[in-house]
């Protein structure tokens, strides 16, 4: 038997160990400190609320305040008030062709309305900044704030909005050329925006960055700045407690020791979940999603970097049957994992049954079965050295990107997510497919070279190159085009009216934002977190903001 085992050739990936060790196992929270900060925040919150709801304030000033609150990461405190104000302003049907409104103002209002799902059209309001040939006026290069605002607004575009496509090209080139000559904090803001677009960014990372910028503003409001800093630190304390909880759970499972071939990335999994929802009311949802991502990561590595095809045949059947009796048939090394997976879902079901939502686990399990079937197909392609046509590859790869499953599990702990939402996701609606496409093609671009080095030929890039007689560079360009079009679809699907709550729609949007952050610079930040994710994790979960 030992000799037989020795003869098994496994496609090991030799993943790097966790960067964090036991750093987050220890819980150093201080209830007294948290309570003191909470009380201060409540006082400041009332001050800010008064600013927001004050009568007689000009629309332009109120919209600028809403934009500042959102950028500082504190708008969730005033969700209801902001929705009401934006609805009232939207109903005014403001004539933005009035010369009283400059480019900065018009673009900011357009972006804020679109971010909240209001169908404001772009053709009517940006036309006056173009010449008779339809080109944007060169003189706009003297208006850095206006350019930046238009640049950020253009990322809210939908299909067919060529004026926003052109605006993005024009503002990108213009901002790159003028950035070195700007004064900070505007220069810093422009340089950051060119690397990380506001609409595609992780809200917590963007909040921390903007707090440091806002501190440099000459016209900053000191109460608002203090409120944002304290709120950031208080949320960080909550997130650290949750990270402590999932780190302890992960350590007690001891799957890292039992399955040393797999990536040990529970901290990065929590970072992912926190990007989907950071607000206090989603605490349970974050923990549940983190656990499902961590378990999926092990399944992925088992198919991709360890299991033989015979072992994977048995494991696929065991997941399909979803029964503890299946453990008898499984290879020894995967038994502890299978048991832990079934027990995790039993805990979920028990928890959700208390609120009459145990049905949610059924949808999650069915989605996991679909994911595992697709992993199995991919593993067989690898073993056989089969390179499928791009259409066949993509059909399977949209499932193996894991976002079908993780969009579903992101709603497990969201109390407002109802059966109709899970049913909607199970039918692969347009918004979900757009999300799957972004996840798939951006992942494929980032992992292509590493997978090629490991002998993996059934990659999206290879398949597209062969089908279209394309070079690697042409394939990558096409994949970015696919992602950009998918973002347009997501923007469209976030518009009102929608049969689904923004609570649900924002989960899909935020899952895509995490892709943009994690694979920034065409790097696989999840597998190799040192360069891309480590600085973010330190800023979000280790270092508080100095008050």
Curated annotation (Swiss-Prot):
The EC number(s) attached to this protein equal: 4.2.3.-
For molecular function, the Gene Ontology terms on record are: beta-elemene synthase activity; germacrene-A synthase activity; lyase activity; magnesium ion binding; terpene synthase activity
Q: Which reaction does it catalyse?
A: (2E,6E)-farnesyl diphosphate = germacrene A + diphosphate; (2E,6E)-farnesyl diphosphate = (1S,2S,4R)-beta-elemene + diphosphate
Per the record, the similarity remark reads: Belongs to the terpene synthase family. Tpsa subfamily.
The residues the record assigns to binding Mg(2+) 1 are: 300, 304
What InterPro entries does the record point to?
A: Isoprenoid_synthase_dom_sf, Terpene_cyclase-like_1_C, Terpene_cyclase_plant_C1, Terpene_synth_N, Terpene_synth_N_sf, Terpene_synthase-like, Terpene_synthase_metal-bd, Terpenoid_cyclase/PrenylTrfase
Organs and tissues of expression: Expressed in leaves.
Q: What is known of its domains?
A: The Asp-Asp-Xaa-Xaa-Asp/Glu (DDXXD/E) motif is important for the catalytic activity, presumably through binding to Mg(2+).
Q: Which GO terms describe its cellular component?
A: chloroplast
This one is known as Germacrene A synthase
Task: Say what the protein does.
Answer: Sesquiterpene synthase involved in the biosynthesis of volatile compounds widely used in aromatherapy and folk medicine, and present in culinary herbs. Mediates the conversion of (2E,6E)-farnesyl diphosphate (FPP) into germacrene A and beta-elemene. Not able to use (2E)-geranyl diphosphate (GPP) as substrate.
Residues reported to bind Mg(2+) 3: 443, 451
Q: Is Transit peptide tagged as a keyword? A: no
């Amino acid at each position: 038997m030992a000799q037989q085992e020795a003869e098994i050739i496994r496609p090991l990936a030799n993943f790097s160990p966790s960067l964090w060790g036991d750093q987050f196992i220890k819980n150093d929270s201080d209830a007294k400190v948290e309570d003191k900060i909470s009380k201060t925040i409540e006082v400041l919150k009332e001050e800010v609320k008064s600013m927001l709801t004050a009568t007689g304030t000009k629309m332009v000033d109120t919209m600028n305040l809403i934009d500042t609150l959102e950028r500082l990461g504190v708008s969730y405190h005033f969700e209801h008030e902001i929705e009401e104000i934006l609805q009232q302003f939207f109903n005014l049907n403001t004539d933005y062709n009035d010369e009283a409104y400059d480019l900065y103002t018009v673009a900011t209002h357009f972006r804020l309305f679109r971010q909240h799902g209001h169908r404001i059209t772009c053709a009517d309001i940006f036309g006056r900044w173009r010449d008779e040939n339809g080109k944007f006026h060169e003189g706009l290069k003297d208006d850095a704030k206006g350019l930046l605002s238009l640049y950020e607004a253009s990322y809210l575009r939908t299909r067919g909005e060529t004026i926003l496509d052109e605006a993005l090209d024009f503002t990108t080139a213009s901002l790159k050329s003028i950035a070195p000559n700007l004064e900070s904090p505007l220069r810093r803001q422009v340089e950051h925006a060119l690397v990380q677009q506001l609409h595609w960014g992780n809200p917590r990372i963007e909040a921390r960055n903007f707090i440091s910028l806002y501190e440099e503003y000459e016209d900053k409001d000191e109460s608002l700045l203090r409120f944002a800093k304290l709120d950031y630190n208080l949320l960080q304390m909550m997130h650290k407690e949750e990270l402590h909880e999932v780190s302890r759970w992960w350590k007690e499972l001891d799957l890292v020791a039992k399955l040393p071939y797999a990536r040990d990335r529970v901290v990065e999994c929590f970072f992912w979940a926190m990007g989907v929802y950071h607000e206090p009311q989603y605490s349970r949802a974050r923990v549940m999603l983190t656990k499902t991502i961590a378990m999926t990561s092990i399944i992925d590595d088992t198919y991709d970097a360890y299991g033989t095809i015979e072992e994977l045949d048995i494991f696929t059947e065991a997941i399909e049957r979803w029964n503890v009796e299946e453990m008898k048939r499984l290879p020894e090394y995967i038994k502890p994992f299978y048991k832990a997976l079934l027990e995790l879902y039993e805990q979920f079901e028990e928890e959700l049954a208390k609120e009459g939502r145990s049905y949610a686990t059924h949808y999650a399990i069915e989605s996991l079965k679909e994911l595992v079937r697709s992993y199995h197909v991919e593993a067989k392609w690898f073993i056989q050295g089969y390179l499928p046509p791009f259409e066949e590859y993509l059909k399977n790869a949209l499932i193996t990107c894991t976002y079908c499953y993780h969009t579903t599990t992101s709603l497990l702990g969201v109390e407002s997510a109802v059966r109709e939402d899970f049913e909607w996701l199970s039918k692969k609606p347009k918004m979900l497919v757009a999300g799957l496409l972004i996840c798939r093609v951006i992942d494929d671009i980032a992992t292509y070279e590493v997978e090629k080095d490991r002998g993996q030929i059934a990659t999206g890039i290879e398949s597209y190159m062969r089908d279209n007689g394309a070079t690697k560079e042409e394939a990558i360009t096409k994949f970015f085009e696919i992602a950009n079009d998918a973002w347009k679809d997501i923007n469209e699907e976030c518009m009102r009216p929608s049969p689904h709550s923004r609570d649900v729609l924002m989960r899909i949007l935020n899952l895509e934002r995490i892709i943009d952050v994690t694979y920034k610079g065409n790097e696989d930040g999840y597998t190799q977190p040192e360069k891309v994710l480590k600085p973010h994790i330190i800023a979000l979960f280790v270092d508080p903001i100095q008050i």
